[in-house]
Amino acid sequence: MRRALCLVLALLVLLPFGGMANAEAEVTGRMALDYAENFSVDYYDGGAARLRIGENQDFLLLPAGAAVPAGLEALPRIPIPAEKLYLASSSAPDLFLRMDALDTVQYSSTTAENWRIPELRAAMEEERIWYAGKYSAPDYELLLSEGCGLVVENTMILHNPAVKEKLEELGFPVLIEYSSYEPHPLGRVEWIKLYGLLTGRLPEAEAFFDRQAETFRSAEQAAPSGKTVAFFHITPSGGVTVRRRADYITRMIELAGGETAITDLPEAENALSTETIQMESFYAQARDADVLIYNSTAVGAVPDMEAFLALSPLLADFRAVRTGEVWCTEKSMFQRSSAAADIIRELHAIVSGEADDQLSCFYRVK
């Protein structure tokens, strides 16, 4: 009996110390996020931070000279502030521009001629940012010879796992951003906070996001207009590509006080947010839409009403054509990942009948 009691007491003495040996360092703070759901950041004493993205990415962000928090020794490390970044995600560069961090970017997967944002095109033409190959075929020799502190990919790289493995094999940390999975348009913009933390520009990132959030809140307070909107483009084969209910463009139309005119679509068979339907189906659903918005990014802009009507003889019978409510997107709109709040504000102006003919993201087709 006495021996058993001694054994129990010994275990009670040893257990706390064993627990302490395996204890993880205490989290001292967490990045405040209002809309983004696909990443989180925990802070630790000494400046280290733990970054989680999606369900299977876990990193330790480690400033120079900072100690590794207990329990996080096994995590892959990203030195911060990161320099010489390779942005293989086309949605990221605009966010770097808005927080004045292009000087931390060394490489892009988009060529100069394919940029519609003047500042990014100029940065590449002036060779402040270099083209390092598209995401699926990076220029490994260039990255090795000039150095690369971090590779930022989008989820397309998941279809090319060998590329990610090769980059990591060469010693480059690879981060896959999931901003396109954010359910709220402002969630996409809030990824600027992560990029700010990675580059030492968090105050600038937070200030930009706060301005965008205020712009959004101003538009959100407006009453629903009841106006229906068809956002589309016509393919070279004559089909019409429209947005599904779950797509973020449809979500922005709704947040702006409008309603999508396209509601009768087949059940989704994949994760794509678009659907190509026959012109006859589009005509039946969008003929009486209050507003038509043509997506110039996919197949080119329409400079005037004559060019728009030349796309299909059926378009002349649409209500929005008769009322002068046909709009076209500016070519840079989809590269401006920072502009969600501005897009919502301009969409609200369009559906409420208060828009000028020329906006930053749209223009009226006349």
Describe each region flagged by the PLM.
Residues 214-215, 221-303:
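Flexible, glycine-rich surface segments
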Residues 20-93, 204-232, 355-366:
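Bacterial Sec-exported substrate-binding components of ABC uptake systems
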Residues 83, 90-96, 108-119, 159-162, ...:
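Extracytoplasmic ligand-binding site segments that recognize negatively charged/polar headgroups
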Residues 182-200, 204-207, 291-366:
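Structured C-terminal subdomain patch of bacterial secreted/periplasmic proteins
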Residues 49-53, 59-144, 150-156:
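A short, structured surface patch at a secondary-structure boundary
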